[in-house]
Amino acid sequence: QRTNDFIKACGRELVRVWVEICGSVSWGRTA
């Protein structure tokens, strides 16, 4: 259970960072 919660939290953090990077790359291209 603890491992599952850790994986979920880690996944959310990774997605948040990935979206930020992807967003900045997209903005950089359009600008």
Swiss-Prot record:
Intracellular or extracellular location(s): Secreted
Q: Which UniProt keywords apply?
A: Disulfide bond, Hormone, Pyrrolidone carboxylic acid, Secreted
GO CC aspect terms? extracellular region
Entry-annotated residues carrying Pyrrolidone carboxylic acid: 1
Q: What is its main location?
A: secreted
Whether RNA-binding counts among this entry's keywords is no
Report the domain of life of the source organism: Eukaryota
Extract the InterPro entries matched here.
Insulin-like_sf
The answer to whether keyword Electron transport applies is no
Family designation: Belongs to the insulin family.
Subunit-structure text: Heterodimer of a B chain and an A chain linked by two disulfide bonds.
What is the official name of this protein in its record? Relaxin B chain
Taxonomic source organism: Phocoenoides dalli dalli (Dall's porpoise)
